[in-house]
């Protein structure tokens, strides 16, 4: 009991020191995005389905965030974000997701950069969405669909991770690193490691990203040991168009090794109050002496009704080896708050 008294006294003093004005500065901010679309959706080898879908252009989510000014340019910050399936009124991308699936971290930010602990996006995910014209669209972006539709293992966010993002360390140059420990996840051992670099010079942006995955959500191939992914990306803005390009290599070491080579080219051009978006991605998968191919093309128009609300229409064609081709036609609305 004697050991508890000093701790209780310290806690009481801390609460007394936290004035209403100080607590007001730490008040959390509520924010998010709601996206819904309707249309005919199809995947290779399957029939077309007429549906109303959530999160095709951007995954819907709700988040809270806040920070505490510690003085001397140092801040403590946190964020908690959950995906929302608006069409079902349910949390998560799927029923198997934990509640705070999108982000859950706490960390420090200062002149040295930003360091966070918890669950946060990987450098590979960040670079992939930056260097294609349809951004983070899991429903319509050829690049996102080819990388994260089954090729890259370990999810777009890592649990139990330590992540660091630098400020601008040289003219136009920034970098990020992330790693996590497996912490006994079933069927996997070891840690995940990811690094990324970003360079900006006028109309040019370029990135290089590498990650090595040894744990995360499954399923995992038999005899899985690790997977390595390397990606280069770039964009260049002209007066009337922004051009995008990506090239990547994914190698999965398991009982049967798989090597995938991925390419993406795209463009975004302002037309009226919106943007015409076009992207093509090509993937070659090699398993032993067998090769298969995946080709995805998307064309869309994104029209902004305001800074917070846009409407869009997209057509997409996908062709996979040995499967019938698929065509998707959809239109939707997206609102940020």
Question: What residue ranges belong to the model's regions?
Answer:
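Sec/Tat signal peptide C-region and signal peptidase I cleavage site
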Residues: 19-24
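Outer membrane beta-barrel
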Residues: 25-40, 49-182, 189-191, 198-202
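Transmembrane beta-strands of outer-membrane beta-barrel pores
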Residues: 36-42, 61, 82-86, 121-123, ...
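Outer-membrane beta-barrel architecture
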Residues: 63-65, 105-107, 163-165, 196-198, ...
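Repeated loop/turn-to-beta-strand initiation elements of outer-membrane beta-barrel proteins
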Residues: 74-76, 112-115, 170-175, 203-208, ...
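Solvent-exposed loop/turn segments connecting transmembrane beta-strands
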Residues: 88, 152-159, 181-191, 253-259, ...
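Detector for outer-membrane/organellar transmembrane beta-barrel domains
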Residues: 188, 192-298
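Outer-membrane beta-barrel "beta-signal"
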Residues: 303, 325-337
């Amino acid at each position: 009991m004697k050991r508890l008294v000093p701790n209780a006294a310290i806690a009481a003093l801390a609460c007394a020191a936290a004035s209403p004005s100080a607590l007001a500065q730490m008040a959390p901010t509520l924010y998010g995005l709601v996206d819904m679309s309707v249309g005919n959706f199809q995947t290779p080898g399957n029939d077309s389905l007429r549906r109303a879908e959530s999160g095709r252009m951007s995954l819907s989510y709700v988040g809270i965030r806040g920070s505490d000014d510690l003085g001397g340019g140092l801040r403590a910050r946190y964020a908690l974000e959950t995906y929302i399936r608006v069409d079902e009124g349910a949390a998560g991308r799927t029923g198997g997701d934990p509640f705070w699936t999108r982000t859950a971290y706490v960390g420090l930010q200062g002149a040295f950069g930003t360091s966070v602990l918890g669950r946060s996006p990987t450098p590979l995910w960040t670079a992939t969405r930056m260097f294609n014209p349809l951004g983070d669209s899991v429903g319509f972006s050829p690049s996102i669909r080819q990388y994260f539709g089954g090729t890259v293992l370990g999810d777009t966010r890592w649990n139990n991770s330590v992540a660091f993002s630098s400020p601008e360390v040289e003219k136009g140059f920034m970098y990020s690193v992330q790693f996590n420990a497996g912490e006994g996840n079933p069927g996997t051992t070891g840690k995940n490691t990811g690094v990324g670099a970003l360079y900006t010079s006028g109309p040019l942006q370029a990135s290089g990203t590498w990650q090595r995955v040894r744990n995360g959500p499954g399923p995992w191939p038999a005899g899985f040991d690790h997977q390595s992914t390397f990606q280069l990306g770039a964009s260049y803005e002209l007066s009337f168009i922004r051009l995008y390009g990506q090239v990547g290599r994914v190698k999965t070491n398991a009982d049967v090794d798989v090597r995938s080579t991925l390419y993406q080219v795209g463009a975004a051009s302002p037309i009226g109050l919106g943007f015409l978006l076009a992207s093509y991605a090509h993937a070659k998968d090699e398993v032993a002496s067998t090769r298969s191919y995946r080709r995805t093309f998307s064309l869309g128009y994104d029209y902004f009704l305001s800074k917070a609300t846009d409407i869009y229409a997209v057509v997409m064609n996908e062709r996979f080896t040995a499967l019938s081709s698929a065509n998707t036609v959809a239109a939707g609305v997206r609102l940020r708050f």
